[in-house]
């Protein structure tokens, strides 16, 4: 990957945008019986959440193959959070129309029971009915019906898992969201979009030149990214539904590190048009001239908006080594946020604005760290030697990042408290640049 000046790396500041080309978590893959295995994945999970909810998830009645596949996706979704303990529901015979024996399930150790049915109509569409029971309170927590085609069944399973997760934890689930990443195979780069568990990958863009720094628009309809196909780094915005793309930052020098404003109307970018890399604001449709935000004697790069849209968090070496700063959209003095260690890069802010995520060099290793902004407490979430490219889930409960194990690039995930970790290795190609999409419903 070409060296770009507006970024940081271990060897020198001028190499750092190459750190964008690392791996992403396809957050855990479980294949459905009705879907071919288009990716070869190995998943390992370690750790559990501070609280584990015991739940039985029965195969959906009415169609043995599809009913079992639906339940397997739901089980896999909930299992990888580390917050649920599965109770065996084999042979339960539960249907949505039969009464549930709360005491029996409670005796088996299940506080919650999820079950349902699936049937196919004359038009070929499937009706899926689902129920969630609380065996402690002896009532039904949730119940809803879905209708969809065969290719939509997996997404419906994710939606059911989202409902279960939210009803029990009070936090919105992210199983039906999407991720984007760059797949490098040989001399070809592909910008791909997939389900949060890595299934159903779709190619949004293919190029012989590098593609880096993909980032989702707030409504999930577009991706901004950096492409080198014109011979230098240029920031583009692509509409996923039409694949139409427009350049939004194509100025003198390097154009890099796009980040969407919360309202989707603007992008923060790093430009070298006036010399060293500095932070600018450009319009998301490419219609306005760039507005400069930072003016420092050092290199400023890797911007990200705060959730309220009033300020930008970015990486700068103005203090000597790369650290993370915050500045208002009106410019002015920047406030330093990180003080532990001499090297902190790649900032990401949690959806509620309370936690900063970044790559920290500690004891010669590069790890994903989180900083509680109100208290100033730093927590190292990972323990690898080369962990990079963190990205928050839209509910703030999980983090995607890139790791290296046994000399190979793998995708990894960690819960926001560091208790539950996952690794996922891909056999073919290199998967880079994790970015988790927003809620879209």
Curated annotation (Swiss-Prot):
Main location: periplasm
SUPFAM superfamilies tied to this protein: TolB, N-terminal domain, Tricorn protease N-terminal domain
Keyword set, alphabetical order: Cell cycle, Cell division, Periplasm, Signal
GO biological process terms on file: cell division; protein import
Signal peptide: 1-39
Top-level taxon of origin: Bacteria
CC per GO annotation: periplasmic space
InterPro entries registered for this protein in UniProt: 6-blade_b-propeller_TolB-like (IPR011042), PD40 (IPR011659), Tol-Pal_TolB (IPR014167), TolB_N (IPR007195)
UniProt subcellular location: Periplasm
Pfam families: PD40, TolB_N
Cited function: Part of the Tol-Pal system, which plays a role in outer membrane invagination during cell division and is important for maintaining outer membrane integrity.
HAMAP family with a match to the protein in the record: TolB
Family to which the UniProt record says this protein belongs: Belongs to the TolB family.
Subunit structure: The Tol-Pal system is composed of five core proteins: the inner membrane proteins TolA, TolQ and TolR, the periplasmic protein TolB and the outer membrane protein Pal. They form a network linking the inner and outer membranes and the peptidoglycan layer.
UniProt cross-references to PANTHER family, sorted A to Z: PROTEIN TOLB (PTHR36842:SF1), PROTEIN TOLB HOMOLOG (PTHR36842)
Protein name according to UniProt: Tol-Pal system protein TolB
Gene of this entry: tolB
């Amino acid at each position: 990957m070409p060296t770009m000046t507006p970024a940081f790396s271990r060897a020198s500041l001028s190499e750092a945008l190459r750190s964008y080309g690392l791996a992403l978590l396809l957050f855990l893959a479980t294949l459905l019986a009705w879907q071919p295995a288009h990716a070869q994945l190995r998943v390992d999970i370690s750790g559990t959440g501070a609280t584990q909810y015991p739940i039985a998830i029965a195969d959906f009645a009415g169609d043995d193959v599809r009913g079992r596949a639906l339940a397997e996706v739901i089980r896999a979704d909930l299992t990888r959070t580390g917050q649920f303990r599965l109770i065996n529901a084999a042979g339960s015979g539960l249907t949505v129309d039969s009464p549930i024996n709360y005491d029996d399930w409670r005796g088996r150790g299940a506080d919650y029971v999820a079950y349902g049915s699936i049937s196919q109509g004359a038009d070929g569409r499937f009706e899926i009915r689902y129920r969630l029971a609380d065996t402690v309170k002896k009532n039904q927590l949730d119940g809803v019906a879905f209708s969809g085609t065969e290719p939509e069944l997996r997404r419906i399973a994710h939606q059911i898992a989202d409902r279960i997760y939210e009803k029990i934890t009070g936090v919105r689930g992210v199983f039906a969201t999407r991720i984007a990443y760059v797949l490098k195979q040989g001399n070809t780069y592909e910008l791909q979009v997939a389900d949060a568990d890595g299934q159903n990958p779709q190619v949004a863009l293919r190029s012989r030149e590098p593609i880096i720094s993909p980032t989702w628009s707030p409504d999930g309809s577009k991706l901004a990214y950096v492409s080198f196909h014109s011979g230098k780094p240029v920031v583009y915005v692509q509409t996923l539904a039409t694949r139409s793309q427009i350049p939004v930052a194509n100025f003198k020098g390097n154009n890099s590190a796009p980040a969407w404003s919360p309202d989707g109307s603007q992008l923060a970018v790093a430009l070298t048009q006036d010399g060293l890399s500095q932070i600018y604001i450009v319009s998301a449709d490419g219609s306005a001239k760039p507005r400069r935000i930072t003016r420092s004697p050092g290199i400023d790069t890797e911007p990200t908006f705060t959730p309220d849209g009033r300020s930008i968090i970015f990486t700068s070496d103005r203090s000597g080594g790369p650290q993370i700063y915050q500045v208002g959209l009106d410019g002015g003095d920047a406030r330093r946020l990180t003080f532990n260690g001499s090297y902190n890069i790649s900032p990401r802010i949690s959806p509620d604005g309370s936690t900063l995520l970044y790559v920290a060099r500690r004891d010669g290793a590069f790890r994903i760290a989180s900083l509680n902004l109100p208290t100033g407490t730093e927590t190292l979430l990972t323990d690898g030697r080369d962990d990079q490219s963190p990205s928050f889930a839209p509910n703030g409960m999980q983090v995607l990042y890139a790791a290296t194990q046994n000399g190979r690039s793998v995708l990894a995930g960690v819960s926001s408290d560091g208790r539950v970790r996952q690794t996922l290795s891909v056999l073919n190609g290199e998967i880079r640049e994790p970015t988790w999409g927003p809620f879209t419903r």
